[in-house]
């Protein structure tokens, strides 16, 4: 592996033209997750940029990902472990008018005391302040 894998991982901007959207360096964060001499990477492909990839075979997704990892991180060799999960609608992509929807949710909460609207559809996919 040419890259040191220091840090949390990497997000890939669209202009770079990779299939991978991002990669988490799991074994850098949690060394016990990979045997000595191996690394564990969690990779994300497809998304709103390339939704057609959700229809690809597992073998094709692995091949595309490994090819990107070779170019991006200098990965050599072949995977000794792989697991592919396809989530067709995993992370919401907010539309330009999302602010209007957010305001509507705020208005509804103000007119219905005790009703709280929470979740990824409102506050994003990470941890929020709520």
PLM features per residue range, with description:
Residues 23, 43, 69, 82, ...:
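Hydrophobic, well-ordered secondary-structure elements that form the walls
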Residues 29-36, 87-117, 121:
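FAD-binding beta-loop-beta segment adjacent to the flavin cofactor pocket
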Residues 63-68:
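Short, well-ordered amphipathic alpha-helical segments that serve as non-catalytic structural scaffolds
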Residues 5, 74-87:
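A short coil-to-beta-strand element that immediately follows conserved catalytic motifs
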Residues 1-41, 48-55, 59, 71-72:
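Mid-domain catalytic core of redox enzymes
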Residues 119-130:
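A conserved FAD-binding loop/helix module that cradles the flavin
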């Amino acid at each position: 592996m040419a890259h040191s894998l220091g840090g949390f991982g990497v997000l890939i901007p669209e202009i770079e033209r990779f299939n991978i959207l991002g990669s988490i360096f799991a074994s850098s964060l949690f060394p016990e997750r990979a045997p000595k001499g191996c690394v564990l990477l969690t990779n994300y492909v497809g998304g709103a940029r390339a939704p057609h990839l959700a229809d690809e075979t597992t073998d094709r997704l692995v091949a595309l990902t490994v090819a990107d990892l070779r170019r991006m991180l200098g990965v050599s060799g072949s995977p000794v472990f792989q697991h592919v999960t396809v989530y067709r609608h995993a992370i919401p992509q907010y539309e330009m008018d999302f602010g209007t929807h957010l305001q509507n949710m705020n208005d509804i909460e103000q007119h219905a005391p005790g009703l709280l609207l929470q979740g990824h559809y409102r506050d994003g996919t990470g941890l929020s302040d709520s």
